[in-house]
Amino acid sequence: MVKIVTSQAEFDSIISQNELVIVDFFAEWCGPCKRIAPFYEECSKTYTKMVFIKVDVDEVSEVTEKENITSMPTFKVYKNGSSVDTLLGANDSALKQLIEKYAA
């Protein structure tokens, strides 16, 4: 299940308290974000050892700025509290490869 983050404090807490976190930085008005959302949700059900969250770039702008997000969707992988990988764009196969790289 994908959790929607609503504050900087919540984002920081999730990132620091979980070994592997995949973050989808999205916007409600973003067509590609909407297109890949069901696939991201499916991945959260398949790869249950990872935490999947979403951050609305317009609603939680402090996280967006801190993480230097400039395009949507942007997917970031956090391992033990640190950003370790980034994927730009709504590419299902590239997102699956990114997730599988860290799921192993």
From Swiss-Prot:
Question: Active site at which residues?
Answer: C30, C33
PTM description: The disulfide bond between Cys-30 and Cys-33 acts as a redox-active center and is reduced by thioredoxin reductase TRXR.
Q: Please name every pair of cysteines joined by a disulfide bond in this record.
A: C30-C33
Report the residue ranges that make up the Thioredoxin domain in this protein. 2-104
At what residues does the UniProt record annotate the site feature described as Contributes to redox potential value? G31, P32
Localisation? Cytoplasm
Q: Is Chaperone a UniProt keyword of this protein?
A: no
What this chain does, per the entry, is described as: Participates in various redox reactions through the reversible oxidation of its active center dithiol to a disulfide and catalyzes dithiol-disulfide exchange reactions. By modifying the redox status of targeted proteins, induces changes in their structure and activity. Reduces oxidized glutathione (GSSG), thereby acting as a backup for the glutathione redox system. Reduces nitroglutathione (GSNO), a compound involved in the transport of nitric oxide (NO). Also reduces oxidative stress by detoxifying hydrogen peroxide, tert-butyl hydroperoxide and cumene hydroperoxide.
- Can you tell me which family this protein belongs to? Belongs to the thioredoxin family.
Q: Which NCBIfam families match?
A: thioredoxin (TIGR01068)
Q: What is this protein called?
A: Thioredoxin 1
State the organism of origin: Plasmodium falciparum (isolate 3D7)
Lineage here is:
Eukaryota, Sar, Alveolata, Apicomplexa, Aconoidasida
